[in-house]
Amino acid sequence: MSESTKIRDIAQALGVSIGTVDRALHDRRGVNPLTKSRVLQMAKTMGYQPNPAARFLSSKRRVRISVNLPAQIASFWDTVREGIDEEARTFAAFGIDVELHTFPRMGFGEQEAFDAALESKVNGIIIATGRPQDLRGSILKASRARIPVVSVVTDAPGTARLAVVSIDSPASGALAGELLSRLLQGQGKVAVVTGDLAITDHAEKYNSFRASVNAFSPSVQVMEPIQNHEDETEAYETCRTLLRAHPDLNGLYISTANSAPVLQALADVGRLNDHLTVITTDLFPALIPHIESGAVVATLYQRPKSQGQLALRMLNEFLVGGRCPSHQLRLAPHVIMKSNLSFFLDRISMESEMEESNAFAATPKLRKESS
């Protein structure tokens, strides 16, 4: 039967009122059992599918969603926020208020932001957490209060979160490991610059990178990871310390978006474009010249905008439509090199133009605040 069957179609087929059909379908009082049975059977015969979004609109109920994301690294997290902003426009009519809150960086201030969201009695929360074990109790409290929590970018394993949307971190690390192994032809010393191994995403990338290098090139030495805690100054200083201690370094994998200060450190000590194979993460304007010059042989694009869009879409569908999402949605990373850089630049530019053209199509209740 037609998927567009409406309540009025069932009412016409049975010769009863629309109100009677509505009460029968939604198990409300005022319908005798025989009529209710006839309505349910006709709905099944005609292939009726309930429209939870329409029911939500008719209820005139509003939903508040708190989005808690770090301020640093801005080039990455601002793009995640762009995706959330764009997705919010697509369901502006549903009466959903999206509140954006920021905390300094991963692992710093996220507990306070989460607790503030709970106290304000929001209906759903999107988080990026660097200390999932510290938030376990708060996420459980949210779950018991029927406030769904969706993790974005990095997971919060072992918690009561509803779902996670992230890049496939093990795949990213494994790709970087295979690329470096092949480019170094099975010899040399490589280092990994990351944020914090307490963060699920960072730990998964490092572990899979090391396993991949060991599988493809057992003779390549993988050094202990350099953690900079997503701080630009620390990233610069720790990289310079690394290069002073290991002037014979052959390869470098920067596993987070915090690559600008690392590349600056390489340039300042004369190692950029100097027999050092560098693989980075993500794509932003300052990185483009380094890819074009060959100083960066490849970058692994984490699709931050898509992650933001999908996280909000998943939470919205659960709150409005009652659809339980997959517990884990992992996106495939994109490998960007000099030869295909223009394709991704054109694509990102096109997406930005489309977003600007649609900016006035709808005006969602989206508030930006800092915690």
PLM regions with names:
Residues M1-F56, L366-E369:
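N-terminal helix-turn-helix DNA-binding module of bacterial transcription factors
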Residues P50-E112:
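Amphipathic helical "hinge" segments at domain boundaries
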Residues P70-D78, E99-E110, R131, V165-L175, ...:
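Hinge/beta->alpha junction and helix N-cap segments in small-molecule ligand-binding domains
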Residues T90-F94, A145, V213-V220, A245, ...:
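Short helix-capping segments at alpha-helix termini
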Residues I125, T129-S143, F209, Q227-A286:
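Hydrophobic alpha-helical
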Residues R131-A171, F284-E292:
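Flexible loop/hinge segments that line or gate small-molecule binding clefts
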Residues A176-S217, E224, L315, R323, ...:
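An alpha-beta-alpha
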Residues V213, R303-S371:
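Hinge/cleft segment of the Venus flytrap/periplasmic-binding protein
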